[in-house]
Structures are given as structure tokens and as C-alpha cells.
Amino acid sequence: MDVVALGELLIDFACLNMDQDGYPTMAAHPGGAPCNFLAALNKYGAKTAFLGKVGNDTFGALLRRTLEQSGIDTRGLLTDSAVFTTLAFVTFDAQGDRSFSFARKPGADTVLRFDELDLSLLDEARLLHFGSLSLTQEPVRSATQQAAAYAAAHGKLLSFDPNLRLPLWPDAEAAKTQILWGLRQADIVKISDDEVRFLWGCGPEEGAARLLADFGVRLAMVTCGPKGCLLQNAGAAVRVAAPRVLPVDTTGAGDIFGGSAVSRLLQLGRAPEALTEDELTAIGRFAATAASLSTQYPGGISAIVPEETVLRCMEG
């Protein structure tokens, strides 16, 4: 086992079109940042497993089936009959920017407890990945904190993605507090330039430097949308451009970037802080290309393109 992720598995509803009465027609896509991340890893050669919970409902069954079809180990995916599977509704404004609303009061992902986790999966893995959505409320917050402590105590790498979704937090300060906690646990961080501005009011370069100097992060990866990304460790910092594409749906692109980058890191078999400038560039190019190409298709998990397609685009 290479990577285990803990957190939310949900349905992303995206608007396809509006009918003649002005009502949206929506498509239901399997999603959730940790599983988008795992699906990219799996697509690009890693072995993965998921720790989480869905409801005993139609969408929960669909999500389990989707993970199984993606090759993700579902031994750690639990079903709860007392709560519904979490739903997210994604809408776009005239500029193509996304906004989110959620049916999660509570959702199945939020009621996961530490005593329910299959810790044998963590024992097998090289890396644990998590995000801030599993820190929004109890009991999943404590489950995440205890899982991170368990993984660190057993010598595993920890990867964290802030994945800021303000509608799920009581207020911005609560989000900031928990995200900063997550950053302090992490060896590897994938963060967007918008999230850097939210936390510190600065740009990608200063944000990456802060992650290394103030939080002990060993590899910082800052995504900048169509402008590409910045990767930095103790020895080097590189800027990588993203290929130009005409996006259809950017849902999950950041997660796919993160999973793609970690897949390359694991293949190299080197410590994150030991990666050379050339290695960071290669990781960034592959991840930025995979993420960009995914935006040409709807959904998250379903939008991940084959490795041959990524490599062909990089060569072209």
C-alpha cells in the first residue's frame, strides 16, 4: 500500500444547463477531495486505500462502486444507516468561478470516529493524506487528529490540502485555526494561491517560504490555476507553467494535481526535502499537465486522463 486518505467522499452536483423555465439540470459526479487525490494516484501507478463513511443510500452505493472501479481499496469505507451521504452543489458565475453549497447537517463523512478506523491500512501505507473538511466538526475532527498522530508515530509521511470551503465553517477564524493545525502536521502540502492569500495575505513565493520555515513542511506545492504552480523544498524552488486548455469544469483539478505530484514523488523514492531542482520541475510539469487536462471534462474522479495522454501533452 502506498497512500491512505481520510476524509469526505461525496456527490458533486454540477449544473449542465437551464431548462425553459429557468430551472437547472444537474449531473451527479462522484467526488470529495481525498478520493479525487487517491483516484489520480491510482491512475498513475500507486496503490491506495480510503478511510471514510457514506450513508446507506443510493449515492453511498454509487460512491463505493466508483472507488472499487477506480482500484481504490474500500476496506476502510464504512456505511452508516443513520445519516445521508454528503452532497455538494457546484455553481458557476459568468466568469466561470465556482461557488459551493452543501447538504451536510450532518453528512455521513462527519460522523466517522477514530475507533472505527481500520488502522491496519495505515500500518501498510507509506503516506497518509487528509484535508480540512474532516476538521470542520466532531467526531471526524478528533478521528483525523488521532489518525495523523498515529501515522506520524509510525513513521509515515503526512500530506495535507487545506481545500478551503468557507460555507462549511462557523466563521473564517475557525477555518484558519484548523487549517494551520493541519499545516503543522504535514510533510507535504498542496495549497492554492487563493488559500495562501486567505491565510497570510501574501503571494505564492512568500507562502511557500512560510510553510517551510514556520511549519516544518518538507515540500510545498502552491497551485496558481491556469498560471501553473510553484514547488519548493529546502534545496530548490521552481515555477512550472500549465498547458493552455479550454476548461469545462475545474472541480477536482487541485486534488488531481496533488495526487499526480505525489505519484511521481513516490516513484522517485526520495525524501521530499532531497528532491533536486530538475526532479521538482518534472513533478510539477506532470501534475500541472494532468490537472489541466482534467478540466476539459466534467467531474473529479471521472475526469482523470490516462498517463499516456499526460505524457503526450508534455512532449507536444
Predicted features, each with a name:
Residues V4, A149-Y150, G201-G316:
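Conserved phosphate-binding/catalytic region of the ribokinase-like
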Residues D2, L157, I188, R218-L219:
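Proline-centered loop/turn at the N-terminus of a beta-strand
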Residues M1-D73:
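Glycine-rich phosphate/adenosyl-contacting loop at the front of the ribokinase-like
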Residues T86, S132-T136, A291, Y297-G300:
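Glycine-rich phosphate/pyrophosphate-binding beta-alpha loops
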Residues K47-S132, R312-G316:
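Conserved N-terminal subdomain of the carbohydrate kinase-like
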Residues L133-R210, K227-G228:
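Conserved beta-alpha-beta core of the PfkB/ribokinase-like small-molecule kinase fold
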